[in-house]
Amino acid sequence: MNLTNHFLVAMPSMQDPHFKRGVVYVCEHNEEGAMGLVINLPIEISVGNMLEQIEVERDLPVNNPDSLTQSVLNGGPVSEDRGFVLHQPKGQFDSSICINDELSVTTSQDILPLLGTSEAPEKFIVALGYAGWSAGQLEQELAENSWLTMEADAEVIFETPINERWDTAVARLGINPANLSIEKGHA
């Protein structure tokens, strides 16, 4: 089972504050483990303010200021000082992984001055930190019914308001959230 380009949707029984009602986009999953970004846990800073705080210098004018008002996300509890940009594939950056035709993840800083400009991917999210699982750990959590899984949908990532992403993902699975038990092992 390879869950790259899937969502992990936290079951109501999930109590870890990093993942409670969380939706994780799985960027990579293989025999060595898994890596993903929580896409619905905002922190109290906008992308634009973050860029100002880290003193990103721009050579191009900002032509999409609305994209800079979105919240930076807490991508997970691992390396919370490390940034990740999940975006539509566009441009060549020093450290990018093209996941599929709709999504890439970039960890190099060369993307930052372009955010909000005509050279940036039109749609993107910025996360600090990531969710990581060692070999077999995610599979164990799945066996314990900690997560529901579904194929990822870029519309949920880029078009759905942050606070509606969990409900939207559950609804797309055809499940009424009220019918999900908060106890593990029960429907």
Swiss-Prot record:
<comment type="similarity">
    <text>Belongs to the UPF0301 (AlgH) family.</text>
</comment>
<dbReference type="InterPro" id="IPR003774">
    <property type="entry name" value="AlgH-like"/>
</dbReference>
<dbReference type="GO" id="GO:0005829">
    <property type="term" value="C:cytosol"/>
</dbReference>
<protein>
    <recommendedName>
        <fullName>UPF0301 protein PBPRA3139</fullName>
    </recommendedName>
</protein>
<dbReference type="Pfam" id="PF02622">
    <property type="entry name" value="DUF179"/>
</dbReference>
